[in-house]
Structures are given as structure tokens and as C-alpha cells.
């Protein structure tokens, strides 16, 4: 690291474990800055590895999600060498402090440190984490930062690591992802600006939003109960109907917005866990 840029004093706000007592709230929120050494050198940026693949003989290209710079591609030189310090650091689902340089689409990683503070994912939670990563790669354009989405991804990993129900965690993440990347996800009001009623039936127009389920809607649009939409708005998935219909709705929307491009991890979840 260089001394020309001050490090962010608390780059990750890791959520507490479920049931843990809340910490005292500070009187004033500290001002956050983006450390950088020059126009094309970024220092100590909070980030996560989403995906990596081999590059030349000894290096890797890592696709990372960063808090203030969005999704970027970095060359990790020498990371494939047996004794490289980067081999154990550049892991998915672990908070990192990343530094890089360059101005092309493919930048050069100059530093990576493990921040810690998060439990590893395993089992179903690990599959869900890979699914979330694939969605981020598909929906997030390069260098298009979404700090709220970055924070929600951190929350999602924390919830999965602590054993919260994957169905609820994934539906919440999917909704935030669509909202932050430009897709309207208001579920409590219709396109006609009327409040959604629990006892009525609706459809979700991918281009406009919630509509009444009348005879002129395309037959492949799933019909959803108003109660389901209201439950999803509140992240309440205790009703079996809400669990089933929310899964159908989100599959429909994700498939539509991706132009029919299949998600590899989604099929695994369908086959193994029905998530």
C-alpha cells in the first residue's frame, strides 16, 4: 500500500449475527472517502471476488464487485504460482481490501488483503452464494457502482452464513438487485397507482409493474395473489403460497430481463434444493 492515500477506517460494515445485541449507534456517521493515489491508481477498496479464470501461464483474471467502482476485471499476476500469497486471499465470499492500477478495461491488481469478520459458506448456503454471484455478473455492467447493492450483498452472505432460510434470503437479494440495476420492483401499488389488495389477483408487467390480472395479459405471465406481493414487499415469507408464488414470479422476471439466457446455478438450485 502507498502512504499517499488514507485507508478507509471501516471499509466493511459486517452485519451482526442473528440474535446478537445491537451495538450503540454513533452520534455522527463518519464521512466516507474513496482512497486513491492518482487518477489511475485505486487503493484499499472494499470488494469481493465474484469469479476468476486462468490468464496466461501463472496469472488469474478476477471479476470483482467493489463498493465504489462497481464490477471490474483485474489481472492477478503470478496468482497461480504454488507459493503466491494471493492464492489464499482471492477467495469468493470473503471481504477483501483491493488495490489496482491501470485505465484499460483489464486493470492490474497491486494489492489484496483479507479483511475477515465473516463466516465461510457451506452446503446450501454455498450454492446460494454462487447463484448470487452469477446474478451480479449478469446484471451489473462494468464500472457501474451500486453501493447499496454492495452492502446488501454483504448482508446476504452474512444471512446465508448464519443459516437463515435460503428462500427468503434469495428473494430479498433478487429484488434489491433488480431495483438497483434499473428495474422497477414496487409491489404494493399498481401501474394505475392503486393500492394492491390482498384478496385480488395480479400480474407483474416486466416493463411497467403490477397490473390487474385481466383477460388481456399474455398467458405466460404468472398470476400472483395480492397477499403474495404485499408479503414480498415486507420480506415476509411465512406463508406457503408466498414462497411458491414469489419463486415463480422472480424466475419469470429474471428470465425476461436476461433475454432467456439460462443461469447455470439456478438450474442446480432447482434440481437439488428447489430454491
Curated annotation (Swiss-Prot):
Domain of life: Bacteria
GO term, biological process aspect, one: double-strand break repair
One GO CC term on file: bacterial nucleoid
Keywords on record: DNA damage, DNA recombination, DNA repair
Transmembrane segments: none
InterPro entries in UniProt: ARFGAP/RecO (IPR037278), DNA_rep/recomb_RecO_N (IPR022572), NA-bd_OB-fold (IPR012340), RecO (IPR003717), RecO_C (IPR042242)
Cystine connections: none
Region of interest (Disordered), ranges: 1-36
One Pfam entry name: RecO_C
Similarity annotation: Belongs to the RecO family.
Protein purpose: Involved in DNA repair and RecF pathway recombination.
Protein's recorded name: DNA repair protein RecO
Record organism: Burkholderia thailandensis (strain ATCC 700388 / DSM 13276 / CCUG 48851 / CIP 106301 / E264)
Source taxonomy: Bacteria, Pseudomonadati, Pseudomonadota, Betaproteobacteria, Burkholderiales
Gene that this polypeptide is encoded by: recO
